[in-house]
């Protein structure tokens, strides 16, 4: 899941709040976060999944992008490929969910109050497929953050330091780890948006 909707609020979402947006059972993590050094195979895994998504959705897949830490060379990451999928209307699940399910994707998150965001788990690779509607501001934010970290080693390295420090803690939910990164993400985005 992405950082908290209101990233100025450092209070992690409760299990009840997370269960509200989770499709199926919310299972606690209750462990530290595993981060791996950058793996050059990650872009290849993305390419394979992007082809799978495009093959089943055709022109309904308006944009398919590799996002998140695995998309930034030199950045440590949870070994989960984050993919951004842009469709015409993410709330209209009938237009894309059955097709994604045919190739093994499973809907896990439905956030109607946050840009109609959806998250699917991948069929045979650790994948978080984030689905947004065309024109949603979060699309630009995700791409700008990725591109900024790719081009700015000092921010990439600072982000990695914060991630490593936070990853050592035990987190009840993985989302709490993501929420804890909100302040560093905001700090970096201020610089990215100033250009």
UniProtKB/Swiss-Prot annotation:
The record ties this protein, via InterPro entries, to: GrpB/CoaE (IPR007344), NT_sf (IPR043519)
Highest taxon of source: Bacteria
Where composition is biased (Polar residues), the residues are: 1-12
Region Disordered: list its residue ranges. 1-21
Looking at the UniProt entry, the stretches that span the membrane are none
Task: Please name the Pfam families in this protein's record.
Answer: GrpB
Family of this protein: Belongs to the UPF0157 (GrpB) family.
Q: What is this protein called?
A: UPF0157 protein BH1888
Q: Which organism is it from?
A: Halalkalibacterium halodurans (strain ATCC BAA-125 / DSM 18197 / FERM 7344 / JCM 9153 / C-125) (Bacillus halodurans)
């Amino acid at each position: 899941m992405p950082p908290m909707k209101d990233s100025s609020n450092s209070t992690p979402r409760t299990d009840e709040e997370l269960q509200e947006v989770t499709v199926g059972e919310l299972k606690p993590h209750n462990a530290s976060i595993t981060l791996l050094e950058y793996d050059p195979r990650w872009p290849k895994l993305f390419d394979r999944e992007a082809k799978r998504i495009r093959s089943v959705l055709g022109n309904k897949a308006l944009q398919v992008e590799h996002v998140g830490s695995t998309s930034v060379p030199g950045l440590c990451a949870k070994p989960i490929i984050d993919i951004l999928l842009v469709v015409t209307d993410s709330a209209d699940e009938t237009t894309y969910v059955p097709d994604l399910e045919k190739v093994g994707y499973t809907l896990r998150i439905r956030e109607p109050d946050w840009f109609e965001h959806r998250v699917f788990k991948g069929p045979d690779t650790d994948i978080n497929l984030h689905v947004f509607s065309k024109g949603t501001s979060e699309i630009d934010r995700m791409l700008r953050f990725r591109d900024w970290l790719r081009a700015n080693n000092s921010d990439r390295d600072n982000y990695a330091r914060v991630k490593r420090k936070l990853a050592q803690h035990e987190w009840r939910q993985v989302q709490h780890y993501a929420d804890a990164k909100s302040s560093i993400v905001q700090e970096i985005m201020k610089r990215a948006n100033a250009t």
